[in-house]
């Protein structure tokens, strides 16, 4: 069906306005998928977005941060590799905590499912603890973003300051603001926060010119989103979105983990649930088995020496089938059905109106998930996008739009939840309904509830229930200085203004006195400017530590190479060297190796001292072997030796 002239005209006017009003960014802008389980970074090269491989050569990076006993911070694959022996200080899936209160039901569930500590910060937020220090989830996210930033900088061979970062479509305001804070902590300017399904749609539809209605089913490591979009000649308009910010691969891992622990307890009578190292080994085996069962019908979970009792060591050897996995995780898969139906209803379409269904996120590879999607939409999902990379590629496209590299794409996203204020009797009065296109601005006139009232408290809520007690408080402020008047007389204009990131600004103005007040909502909690400044400084300190650590490793490598080369040369010319000179070199080699060994063991060793010993050994060896070379070429010396 062709779009109406009215819609066509509105779209084109909006497109022109957006282009003229947008500020182009002259520097490189990267696209980052900050995932619960894995993260990725991409850049636009010409007309094509490209994933950038990390230092380990991988296209995705585990969203894992660890702190070692030596005070070193590890990010990505190195952090994940040591998680079994350092589980309580290895932080993963912290995106599930970002922007959340400690008392939230989702947080309370997670506390018993992870080996590290989740603690209550002074502002009521959920933070994490490692090595007796606390970190906000935004700070941990910042460490992962920094890894992505460094990956891009190594590829581009220049500094990167700007990025587009993706978030789950169903993230609330506090979670979006916390994601921006994560970038600020490491000195990365997050120009735009883009919804993950929308980014995936960009990756899919960049080269599509024909009109389409698509559904993006995004089941990742920690969150589930479903979005319905209209794509028409470069315009990507989100019609509706729904989801669950606490449903993903981590939950599937937990279900399988619990099944393995239960099976082992039945067989041996031993409960492993309080053995952190064993639980971490089982968690990794569960994830591996889950992935394998997407491409094979059965596997074996094999964990030797998982524990021991008086009778000796115990092992886990457990055959496991795809059918078993599907039965265990059926309740999780079923939780995706209702959001899909709601999204279709909100978009005012039926499943038959959908042209293509995109599967995004690692969990969408599970055959049972694909079967569920097929039943919901009556068609097989499209294979046009890589589930692990589509979001980062879409972020890179939006980054290119902001930098001016791409000019024929317009993204019209929506707010996932309704926004409004508390009115008399605890009623939730909506100003902006869910699935409203953003940016968006809406004003409404309210009045006082009591005679003589000189101030009003504006409480801002997000949600879909009729009463505020059932919705989420995301901010509040007071408008004072209202002239006393009978109740219902003052005219107070409340305005909601949502930017393209989904960040909300709320203002209230007394139309008689022109007094006004406003708030940029960062949630009922969130990081203060002071906390962000402290974290920025900490990030810089870690940056210096990381640089120092790298320098120390490079210096140690140089020392080891020189010591080996010199040692080999001494052996080669043993009979021709003066014994005193030879012993002096050997002593210098021993002294250098001892210093390097102390440095690698974590002792306070000055790199300059190591460098000095390297220079001294190099100078001594060069002088000695130069003299040896001269002697070997001197006829008199040669003859003298022959005549003796």
Swiss-Prot record:
InterPro entries: ATPase_NBD, Chaperone_DnaK, Heat_shock_70_CS, HSP70_C_sf, HSP70_peptide-bd_sf, Hsp_70_fam
UniProt keyword rRNA processing, yes or no: no
Localisation per UniProt entry: Mitochondrion matrix, Mitochondrion nucleoid
SUPFAM superfamilies (UniProt xref): Actin-like ATPase domain (SSF53067), Heat shock protein 70kD (HSP70), C-terminal subdomain (SSF100934), Heat shock protein 70kD (HSP70), peptide-binding domain (SSF100920)
Cellular component terms per the entry's GO annotation: cytoplasm; mitochondrial nucleoid; mitochondrion
Keyword Transit peptide: yes
Gene Ontology terms describing biological process: chaperone cofactor-dependent protein refolding; iron-sulfur cluster assembly; protein refolding; protein targeting to mitochondrion
Main location per the UniProt record: mitochondrion
Function statement: Plays a role in facilitating the assembly of some protein complexes inside the mitochondria. It may initiate the events that lead to refolding of imported precursors in the matrix space.
Protein family according to the UniProt entry: Belongs to the heat shock protein 70 family.
PANTHER family: HEAT SHOCK PROTEIN 70KDA (PTHR19375)
Annotated protein name in UniProt: Heat shock protein SSC3, mitochondrial
């Amino acid at each position: 069906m062709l779009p109406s002239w009215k819609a066509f005209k509105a779209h084109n006017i909006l497109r022109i306005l957006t282009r003229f009003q947008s500020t182009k960014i002259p520097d490189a802008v990267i696209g980052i998928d900050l995932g619960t389980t894995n993260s990725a970074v991409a850049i636009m090269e010409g007309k094509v977005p490209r994933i950038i491989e990390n230092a380990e050569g991988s296209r995705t990076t585990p969203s894992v941060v660890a702190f070692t006993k030596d005070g070193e911070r590890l990010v990505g694959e190195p952090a994940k590799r040591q998680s079994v022996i350092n589980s309580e200080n290895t932080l993963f899936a912290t995106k599930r905590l970002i922007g959340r209160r400690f008392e939230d039901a989702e947080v309370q569930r997670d506390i018993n499912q992870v080996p590290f500590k989740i603690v209550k910060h002074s502002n009521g937020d959920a933070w994490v603890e490692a090595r007796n220090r606390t970190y906000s989830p935004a700070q941990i996210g910042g460490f992962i973003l920094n890894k992505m930033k460094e990956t891009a900088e190594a590829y581009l061979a220049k500094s990167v300051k700007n990025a587009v970062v993706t978030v789950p479509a169903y993230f609330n305001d506090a979670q979006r603001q916390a994601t921006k804070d994560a970038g600020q902590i490491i000195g990365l300017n997050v120009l735009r926060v883009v919804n993950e399904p929308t980014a995936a749609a960009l990756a899919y539809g960049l080269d599509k010119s024909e009109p389409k209605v698509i559904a993006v089913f995004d089941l990742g490591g920690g969150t589930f989103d479903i979005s319905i979009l209209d794509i028409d000649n470069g315009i990507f308009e989100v019609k509706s979105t729904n989801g669950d910010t606490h449903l993903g691969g981590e939950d599937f891992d937990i279900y399988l983990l619990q099944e393995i622990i239960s099976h082992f307890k039945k067989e041996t009578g031993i409960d492993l649930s309080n053995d952190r190292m064993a639980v971490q080994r089982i968690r990794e085996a569960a994830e591996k088995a889950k992935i394998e069962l997407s491409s094979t019908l059965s596997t074996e979970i094999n964990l030797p020496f998982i524990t021991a009792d008086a009778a000796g060591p115990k092992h886990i050897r457990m055959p496991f089938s795809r059918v078993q996995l599907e039965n265990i995780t059926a309740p999780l898969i079923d939780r995706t059905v209702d959001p899909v139906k709601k999204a279709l209803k909100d978009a005012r379409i039926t499943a038959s109106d959908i042209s293509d269904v995109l599967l995004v996120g690692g969990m969408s590879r599970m055959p049972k998930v694909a079967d569920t999607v097929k039943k919901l939409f009556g068609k097989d999902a499209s294979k046009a996008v890589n589930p692990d990379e589509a979001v980062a590629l879409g972020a890179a496209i939006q980054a290119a739009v902001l930098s001016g590299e791409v000019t024929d794409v317009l993204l019209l996203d929506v707010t996932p939840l309704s926004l409004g204020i508390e009115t008399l009797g605890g009623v939730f009065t909506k100003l902006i309904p869910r699935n409203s296109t953003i940016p968006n601005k809406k004003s409404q006139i309210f009045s006082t509830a009591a005679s003589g009232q000189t101030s009003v408290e504006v409480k801002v809520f997000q949600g879909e229930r009729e009463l505020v007690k059932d919705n989420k408080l995301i901010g509040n402020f007071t408008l004072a200085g209202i002239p006393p008047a009978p109740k219902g007389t003052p005219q107070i204009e409340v305005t909601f203004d949502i930017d393209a990131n989904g960040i909300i600004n709320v203002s209230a103005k007394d139309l008689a006195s022109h007094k006004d007040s406003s708030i940029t909502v960062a949630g009922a909690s969130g990081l203060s400017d002071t906390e962000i400044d402290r974290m920025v400084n900490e990030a810089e300190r870690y940056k210096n530590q990381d640089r120092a650590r790298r320098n120390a490793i490079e210096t140690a490598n140089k020392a080891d190479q020189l010591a080996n080369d010199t040692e080999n040369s001494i052996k080669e010319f043993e009979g021709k060297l003066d014994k005193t000179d030879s012993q002096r070199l050997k002593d210098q080699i021993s002294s250098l190796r001892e210093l390097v060994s102390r440095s690698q063991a974590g002792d306070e060793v000055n790199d300059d001292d190591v460098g000095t010993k390297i220079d001294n050994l190099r100078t001594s060896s060069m002088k000695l072997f130069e003299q040896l070379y001269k002697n070997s070429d001197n006829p008199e010396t040669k003859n003298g030796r022959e005549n003796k």
